[in-house]
């Protein structure tokens, strides 16, 4: 089993036990140990008051070395867990906290192999969707640039981003794309080609079209 969980004494108080969950191989254990477990156990101020107060202090930056998000649904929590985050569960509370502790093992940005450019930038998209969206934002710094995340695949839970310029992209087209993404009902997405089959029309043209 690669799923792991362990008890944490909040602020060193055995009466306030929390549960930390993560998937082995998906997290950097030194980050979990140094930036989550140790501060939670050693910061005695976190044990003062009730758990709701501790949640607020942790969410607002008590563990300042990590980004933290509050999750209120099981789908959000599971999505973060399989993405390399660790989850901190509080007994009797309906929320959990998600910490970014991923391994961050990914291919570096490099020149495209299939379509090498003759002029201009020589960086290409990689397997990390966050890296790809950051590449777009570096090249297109307009405040109108919008990035919306959708999740496709019942089993793979693959993130897919809709990126467009607000005020320039046709709102109806953006809406149709998002509706089609949300309507895709498959187990998993292996490549962008899988999405293209569901998003484009079957008209006789060499170019993919939105119906």
Question: What do these predicted regions represent?
Answer:
Residues 1-211:
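Cytosolic regulatory modules rich in charged/polar residues
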